Amino acid sequence: MIDVVAAVIKKDNKYLIAQRNRDKHFAFHWEFPGGKVDKNETFENALKREILEELSIDIKIKNKIASEKYKDEKINVEVHYFLCKTLDLEIILSEHENMKWVLKKDLLNFTLAPGDSKIVKYL
């Protein structure tokens, strides 16, 4: 099983979701951005690194919200979700197709990656 971290970034009562790249597993699904934890890396350091790489922003991690396991024929992961806030104003996407700031009540109107839809209840 691979550990993955995801940032649930909240700003002005909206949450940031990003659309997965067309070449990735679950292409065009929406997700809370993040990525794989490297060997000997803490979840928090991995999350800060991934968000800087993918969105070009620095984040402040507030607390862990939940963990969800997902397995299919291609992947076997445990995703660790952290509530965060952005410390920057401008987001520059490097890996995603698109991004949106969405109210909690509207999150489930998007096709979310597995696991991400399950944690909406914790927000």
Q: Which functions belong to the PLM regions below?
A:
Residues K10-K14, D23, D38, T86-L89:
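Short, charged/polar surface micro-motifs in flexible loops or helix N-caps
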Residues L83, I92-Y122:
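NUDIX/MutT-family hydrolases
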Residues M1-L16, K36:
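Conserved N-terminal beta-strand and adjoining loop/helix that marks the start
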Residues K24-F28:
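A conserved beta-turn-beta hairpin within the catalytic core of GNAT-like acetyltransferases
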Residues F32-K64, L103:
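The catalytic Nudix box helix
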Residues I9-K10, I17, C84, W101:
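Conserved hydrophobic "DFG−1" position in protein kinase catalytic cores
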Residues D3, D58, E68-E90, K100, ...:
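Active-site-adjacent beta-strand/loop module that shapes the phosphate/pyrophosphate-binding cleft
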Residues R20-R22, L112:
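Short coil/turn segments
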